[in-house]
Amino acid sequence: MSIMQVEVVSSEQKIYSGEATFIVVPTVQGELGIYPRHEPIMSLVRPGALRLTVPGEDKEVLVAVSGGVLEVQPDKVTVLADVAVRSAEMDRARAEEAKKAAEAGISQAKDDKALAEAHKVLAAAIAQLKTLDYIRSHKK
C-alpha cells in the first residue's frame, strides 16, 4: 500500500500531520482526489470537507476548510487553510449561528477590514456546515 505525508495547517495551528493513502480536497475546480505519487500541482481551496483515508483507520478523517492553498508533490500533500476545524470539534447550531452573524456582518460592515473578517467567518461556517452535511449523508 502506497502512502503519502499530509500536512493540514491553519493560521492558528497544525490540524493534521501524518500519513494517508488517499485525500479529497475541495478546490475551486471541484473536488480533487489525490493518491500517492500524484503529479505536482497547486490549486486554490474552496470551503468544504477535506477527507483523508488514513492507514489503520476505519473511518475517514474529516476537516472543514474555509479556503486556502493546496500543494501536491509525489510523496507529500500540504494544505495551507485560512481556517480549518476537525469534524469532532464541530457543532451544527454554532455553525449556523456563526453563518447568520457573518451574513449580518457583511451587510453592516463599515470598512474593508470588517468586511474581510465577516467573509472569513462566513467561509468557515459554510465549510463546517458542508462537512456536517457530508457526515450526515454518509452515516451507515
UniProtKB/Swiss-Prot annotation:
Function of the molecule: Produces ATP from ADP in the presence of a proton gradient across the membrane.
Family: Belongs to the ATPase epsilon chain family.
Name recorded for this polypeptide: ATP synthase epsilon chain
Any one GO molecular-function label of the UniProt entry: ATP binding
CDD domains per record: F1-ATPase_delta
Species the sequence originates in: Neisseria meningitidis serogroup B (strain ATCC BAA-335 / MC58)
Entry-linked SUPFAM superfamilies: Epsilon subunit of F1F0-ATP synthase C-terminal domain (SSF46604), Epsilon subunit of F1F0-ATP synthase N-terminal domain (SSF51344)
GO cellular component: plasma membrane; proton-transporting ATP synthase complex
Membrane topology field: Peripheral membrane protein
A single GO BP: proton motive force-driven ATP synthesis
